Amino acid sequence: MKEILNALYHQKDLNDGEVKKLFTLIINEKVSPAQLGAVLCALKIKGESFKEISVAATTLLEHAPKPFDSGLDLIDNCGTGGDGLKTINISTIAALIASSMGLSMAKHGSRSVSSHSGSADLLENLGVNIEMNPTQLENCFKQTHFGFLFAPLYHQSFKKSAPLRKELFTKTIFNCLGPLINPLRPKIQLLGVYEKSLCKTMALALKALGVKRAMVVNGGGTDEIVLHDTTHACELKNNGILEYDLSAKDFDLPPYDLKELQIKNAQESVQACLDILENKGKDSHTMVVVANVASLLYLSHKAKDLKEGVGMTLEHLKTKVPYTHLQKIIRLSHA
């Protein structure tokens, strides 16, 4: 541990062996609170490399139980969170809609730290059992194409280090790791990050982890694809990374103000979700979710481009199938 800290104090990147050793110690609770705080702050000040992030994620995955084997190329749209803008839960609503369209969504998530409603909070408030056992999870997934994996159930180091991380008053490597350590190891990811500068780093980390297809995005300071501002994207495709910007025009959708996405409490988040699924949501809410579903369809090769994905999603919402689909998920999650 002394050597690892010394390297970080001198602003040196850790090699693969050092990262693996460090996170194995963290998992096994062999690192004191003072040492963990020092490591996280030193990594933050130095700047985490994509190799450090990917090796840390690999180490955490090696210690996480895999609930079942689907045999499919699963999709996740978990983001880092941490943008602090208190918007509706775009990614979770998008995952529910995408799964109702047949996409195999393995949603990894946790409770909110900086928003009114994280993925776990929203699903729980909707009535979903967020702590499904492996049998329940597999059954729900097979019948609905949707499964929610509550991060603290699979990664105890996240749960146990949470109080210390909160006391640091800054984002750490743990924020980056959350979307990379889904125990079902999805091969397709739409990953939102809280800072534009992280897009390329996280795309490289996904590539190193063996993800086949991905888009890492930061839209106007949020960890989502948005319509109120430019969305910066790094797309992992054919083992290469394409970097570009997206605007509302790329989706053939009108722009909306960020303020229209912001909510005051968890109940507003629940109502926004239900309204969108019943095709009676505010246009500003519905359209930003549609843009994110369209991106999932594009990444999954179900739509040839983003505009086609938008059209497919809008037509699907008219059927109100997403709402009945949610009721099925709720029922099966408790079965």
UniProtKB/Swiss-Prot annotation:
> Tell me, what's a Pfam family for it?
Glycos_transf_3
- Co-factor(s): Mg(2+)
Please tell me where anthranilate 1 binds in this chain. 79
The keyword Methyltransferase belongs to this UniProt entry's keyword annotation: no
Please list the residues that bind 5-phospho-alpha-D-ribose 1-diphosphate: 79, 82-83, 87, 89-92, 107-115, 119
Name the SUPFAM superfamilies for this protein: Nucleoside phosphorylase/phosphoribosyltransferase catalytic domain, Nucleoside phosphorylase/phosphoribosyltransferase N-terminal domain
EC number, as in UniProt: 2.4.2.18
Q: Which HAMAP family match?
A: TrpD (MF_00211)
Function text: Catalyzes the transfer of the phosphoribosyl group of 5-phosphorylribose-1-pyrophosphate (PRPP) to anthranilate to yield N-(5'-phosphoribosyl)-anthranilate (PRA).
This one is known as Anthranilate phosphoribosyltransferase
Q: From what organism does this protein derive?
A: Helicobacter pylori (strain Shi470)
